[in-house]
């Protein structure tokens, strides 16, 4: 039976509608391998604003957006043993893939798949945790399947790789704290040559473009001139790869359907968060409280942020 809840959502009432309309939403019951979460914080991703303003993905309107959730379990599905009501959790809401309203983040209560959710230690706030899911899932998708960069660095280091990355000079110390062994200025006119030189004598396991379009040609140039696997995963598709280099677009929701989701959210992340070996990143920029603040937060994200991710407290 459905939990006794009063749900509400920031609704996208029709294609390209602005602003979101905050009003009542259905109550949900978790099925097998699902949990119902009372959301305490949600984060904003670039895809949210582009879905609202450009309507490039097929959706059934009215609909709800959002993928990053941190909150408290209020009900578990019939076969769920890993979670209990009252548990603090962080998880990836995968409604963009399932097209189910209950699987989206911008509402008071969300259904999460158990293989896309992790227990959250009490010392990590909901707001700090909410920055993780989509970036983490996308990084895992790019690294282990055939705001992403922060997670890709940490996952790459955890998997035993030496990580080279690019950033603006003001963020050099930040990405080194995440585990990058060498950092290069992406504004430099010689950044590609500098990376190729630094990789001499090393075997490249692959590259991940966490920006898309503008960064893809440079990333491809570097791997094409280096020894090792000439493979680039990118968060945006449409790039025509040159001969000898494979470019594949990735999206985080795909890990819900294979062993990677469980490996990240069940086997790795809970222990890493508790031990402090994985840091929620980038830094949460809290833009408001309540579902009424979601539109302003999406608009703020669209203006651009550096080493920060826009979050709304609920």
From Swiss-Prot:
EC number: 1.-.-.-
Coiled-coil segments on the chain, per record: none
InterPro entries per record: ADH-like_C, ADH-like_N, GroES-like_sf, NAD(P)-bd_dom_sf, PKS_ER, Trans-enoyl_RdTase-like
Oxidoreductase listed as a keyword: yes
Induction: Induced by the antibiotic concanamycin A. Down-regulated when grown with elevated levels of potassium chloride.
GO CC aspect terms: cytosol
Listed GO MF terms: mRNA 3'-UTR AU-rich region binding; NADPH binding; NADPH:quinone reductase activity
Keyword terms: Oxidoreductase, Stress response
Keyword presence, Oxidoreductase: yes
Enzyme class, UniProt record, top EC level: oxidoreductase
Any one Pfam family match given in the protein's UniProt record, by short name: ADH_zinc_N
Signal peptide: none
Record's function text: Involved in osmoadaptation.
Family recorded in the similarity comment: Belongs to the zinc-containing alcohol dehydrogenase family.
PANTHER family, per the entry: HYPOTHETICAL OXIDOREDUCTASE (EUROFUNG), ZINC-TYPE ALCOHOL DEHYDROGENASE-LIKE PROTEIN C2E1P3.01
Name of the protein this chain belongs to: Zinc-binding alcohol dehydrogenase domain-containing protein cipB
